[in-house]
């Protein structure tokens, strides 16, 4: 698509969202071959695809966050798409991430498009929710001082419990208005659950244990909480500046994957301690 993973203006390669090229492709053979599946979708950078797991296998319901376009929905496994932006107030919305709670409510993150540290400008990010399968959207108030939402996770056992990852505004040494925030009432009220890194890219809930959370950020950090965000421990191990996302290993709850910006994918123990099969970086020893 030509779009950087995190939509920040200084990283764009194009002057307008209309110049981005991309869309959705589908594979029916496990990823060996792919073909475009974009009927009804404008040329766009698709930043996220969400599948409704309750939809029938022969006609999957899919949602796409389209950079500069909004949200597209398909009810036939991606064969055709329709734009679903009723209630989204931004012009050319930078639809960034979608999430689905266990009760079927959808959430949409619209990315911030400005580096401005002020609140209330046209570049503010936003959070929306839909209770009717994306037919209409309602804006959810962000936590006070936040205008850069990045990621959203829901508790699989409590659909009203939301975790929001936010990117700081460019104010102060490390910025402000970032971290992780939690809501126990579907986004009506928020409280800060983590502020040790003001530039948090994403927050993840372990599907095997909803009390376990992971966070990844810019300050060379990955974090873990075992009590629903009350306390956090830094995960040692990944030696890279900009973490992207922490993904629990589906085959081993004691292991995680950590994706990064340009530093590859790391795999190791969730506590960060090296295991007997870890691969160590070789040291250069000239002359030996």
Predicted regions and their residues:
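Extracellular glycan-interacting surfaces
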Residues: 1-288
